[in-house]
């Protein structure tokens, strides 16, 4: 029971209404930066564990 295309469209429409057309690019940019920082943090955390185990 995954999200269908119509569900995704509704979610995107709600986001568009909440943030407006002007702010949406900034919100998406901030979200992408946050995800990138999270992934780098997870990668760095794994590297720290390898160093402490040796």
Curated annotation (Swiss-Prot):
Topological relation to the membrane, as annotated: Single-pass membrane protein
Keywords annotated in UniProt: Cell inner membrane, Cell membrane, Membrane, Protein transport, Translocation, Transmembrane, Transmembrane helix, Transport
Any one GO molecular-function label of the UniProt entry: protein transmembrane transporter activity
Membrane-spanning segments: 1-21
Alphabetized InterPro entries for the sequence: TatA/B/E (IPR003369), TatA/E (IPR006312)
UniProt superkingdom: Bacteria
Localization per Swiss-Prot or TrEMBL: Cell inner membrane
HAMAP family: TatA_E
Function: Part of the twin-arginine translocation (Tat) system that transports large folded proteins containing a characteristic twin-arginine motif in their signal peptide across membranes. TatA could form the protein-conducting channel of the Tat system.
Quaternary state and interactors: The Tat system comprises two distinct complexes: a TatABC complex, containing multiple copies of TatA, TatB and TatC subunits, and a separate TatA complex, containing only TatA subunits. Substrates initially bind to the TatABC complex, which probably triggers association of the separate TatA complex to form the active translocon.
Family to which this protein belongs: Belongs to the TatA/E family.
Protein name as annotated: Sec-independent protein translocase protein TatA
